[in-house]
């Protein structure tokens, strides 16, 4: 089935018809600190996209950048270089800081089951290509040099700001609410290369035709895209906060470099909201993955919470909401574990074969419904609701329920099979002689239709913390 996504660029849904080589780029973290769970909501959304594409049969080439040079809060150069600031505070080099937090980021991604990119593009390793991009733009008269910095002249790019809904007439009004760099020709112009920064002790600088300096964030992403994907990109991912400045600047750089339209589909995820504001380090209202673990939550509890809301809707975070997600996830695993424990060896063997070889039409109906939901703008929250429908269905056997759960988990990624197997291993117990006598007495009682005695024995086991599960192969004893 073809995937449809809401395209920020067209304000409409776009179909991805090319299955053979889908090029996807995501704006990655600035590695000056631990990423917080607000950041990870966006990366979980990106993970759902990549896994859905592959689930549907697309061949995907997925790249993500790592901003290790620093990240100014604005083009005015009045924001602190975050990587350099952290390095000074900790008495380390910027390279040591960026390496540490890059590794920490991907460790947290692994805990959240966020897919590792096919290519990780580290900004500081691509400086020569960034310089070449500026040279070409300079030759084409899209740049100017002012006060030691190279600027992009947005007045030369007629469609500047279209994705963000900034009209040519309204551009000055849109940017009049912020302090403007007095060395700009136009309020929307932005720096490509800094040589005259107010941060004189910046460690990361490189020689260039315009002087010793460093690139802007917008140039980094644009140049690395051009270097890795050449002139074609199918999907660009990011958060909604990237729309109004970063992504429209990136479009301006690349399209002026290529002399053609670039990247048909831009997809943006909404904020995680805490205390009525977006979660951010600047607001001081952020929580890390480690912070969740310290409060006895699994990172997958947070992933479950993210699955309950569509990526284009803001998601309210609270510990009550997270606790509800934890309970729901554990309840799901417990129910599926019960189904698994009830299976005989022949049924268990079926779960190790091709899961999509459906033996019953109702299995195929549920599968098709799941595919339909995730194919339309990644409606994974409806897919999660469908999984609960499967679990509670009276028309599906245990094998069918487990098959569908394992298939759906290829996208929702809650480690369902692993959690069930772990629970099964932990719950298996050694049956002593007294237990064997009682189990045999119960078997005879059931054969003689003495269900009262059979239930009494079952209740006796329950009080001791055991669950009796009747199967074709006999009664299994599990810990409750």
From Swiss-Prot:
SUPFAM superfamilies tied to this protein: Anticodon-binding domain of a subclass of class I aminoacyl-tRNA synthetases, Nucleotidylyl transferase
Pfam family, one: tRNA-synt_1e
Cofactor comment: Binds 1 zinc ion per subunit.
Entry GO MF terms: ATP binding; cysteine-tRNA ligase activity; zinc ion binding
Record localization: Cytoplasm
Principal location listed in the UniProt entry: cytoplasm
Catalysed reactions, semicolon-separated: tRNA(Cys) + L-cysteine + ATP = L-cysteinyl-tRNA(Cys) + AMP + diphosphate
Enzyme superclass (EC): ligase
Protein's GO biological process: cysteinyl-tRNA aminoacylation
An example Gene Ontology CC term for this record: cytosol
Cofactor section: Zn(2+)
Motif 'HIGH' region, chain ranges: 29-39
Alphabetized InterPro entries for the sequence: Cys-tRNA-ligase (IPR015803), Cys-tRNA/MSH_ligase (IPR024909), Rossmann-like_a/b/a_fold (IPR014729), tRNA-synt_1_cat_dom (IPR032678), tRNAsynth_Ia_anticodon-bd (IPR009080)
Record flagged with keyword Cytoplasm: yes
Highest taxon in the source lineage: Bacteria
The family this protein is said to belong to: Belongs to the class-I aminoacyl-tRNA synthetase family.
HAMAP family in UniProt: Cys_tRNA_synth
PANTHER family: CYSTEINE--TRNA LIGASE, CYTOPLASMIC, CYSTEINYL-TRNA SYNTHETASE
Complex and partners: Monomer.
Protein name (database record): Cysteine--tRNA ligase
Organism of provenance: Borrelia garinii subsp. bavariensis (strain ATCC BAA-2496 / DSM 23469 / PBi)
């Amino acid at each position: 089935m073809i995937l449809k996504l809401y395209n920020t660029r067209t304000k409409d849904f776009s179909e991805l018809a090319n299955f053979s080589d889908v090029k996807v780029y995501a704006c990655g973290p600035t590695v000056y600190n631990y990423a917080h769970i607000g950041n990870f909501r966006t990366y979980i959304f990106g993970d759902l996209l990549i896994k859905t594409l592959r689930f549907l049969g697309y061949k995907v080439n997925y790249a993500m950048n790592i901003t290790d040079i620093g990240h100014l809060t604005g083009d005015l150069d009045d924001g602190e270089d975050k990587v350099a600031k952290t390095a000074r505070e900790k008495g380390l080099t910027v390279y040591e800081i960026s390496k540490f937090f890059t590794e920490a980021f991907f460790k947290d991604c692994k805990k959240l089951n966020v897919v590792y990119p096919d290519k990780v593009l580290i900004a500081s390793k691509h400086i020569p290509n960034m310089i070449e991009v500026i040279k070409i733009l300079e030759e084409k008269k899209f740049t100017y040099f002012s006060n030691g910095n190279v600027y992009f002249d947005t007045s030369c790019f007629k469609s500047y700001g279209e994705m963000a809904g900034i009209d040519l007439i309204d551009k000055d009004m849109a940017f009049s609410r912020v302090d403007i760099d007095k060395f700009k020709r136009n309020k929307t112009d932005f720096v490509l290369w800094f040589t005259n920064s107010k941060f004189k002790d910046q460690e990361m600088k490189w020689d260039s035709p315009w002087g010793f300096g460093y690139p802007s964030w917008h140039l980094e992403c644009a140049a690395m895209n051009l270097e890795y994907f050449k002139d074609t990109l199918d999907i660009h991912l990011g958060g909604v906060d990237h729309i109004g400045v970063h992504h429209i600047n990136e479009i301006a750089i690349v399209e002026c470099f290529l002399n053609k339209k670039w990247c048909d589909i831009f997809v943006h995820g909404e904020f995680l909201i805490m205390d009525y504001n977006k979660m951010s380090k600047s607001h001081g209202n952020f929580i890390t993955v480690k912070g969740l673990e310290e409060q006895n939550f699994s990172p997958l509890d947070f992933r479950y919470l993210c699955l309950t809301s569509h990526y284009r809707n803001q998601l309210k975070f609270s510990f009550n909401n997270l606790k509800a997600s934890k309970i729901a996830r554990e309840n799901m695993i417990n129910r599926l574990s019960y189904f698994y424990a009830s299976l005989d060896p022949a049924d268990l063997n079926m779960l190790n074969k091709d899961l999509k070889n459906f033996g019953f039409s109702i299995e195929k109906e549920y599968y098709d419904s799941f595919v339909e939901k995730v194919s339309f703008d990644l409606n994974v929250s409806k897919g999660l609701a469908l999984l609960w429908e499967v679990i509670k269905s009276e028309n599906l056997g245990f094998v069918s329920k487990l098959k569908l759960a394992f298939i759906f988990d290829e996208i929702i990624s809650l480690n369902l099979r692993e959690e069930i197997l772990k629970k099964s291993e932990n719950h298996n117990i050694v049956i002593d002689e007294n237990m064997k006598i009682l189990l045999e007495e119960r078997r005879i009682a059931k054969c003689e239709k003495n269900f009262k005695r059979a239930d009494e024995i079952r209740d006796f086991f329950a009080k001791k913390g055991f669950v009796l599960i009747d199967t074709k192969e006999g009664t299994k004893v599990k810990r409750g």
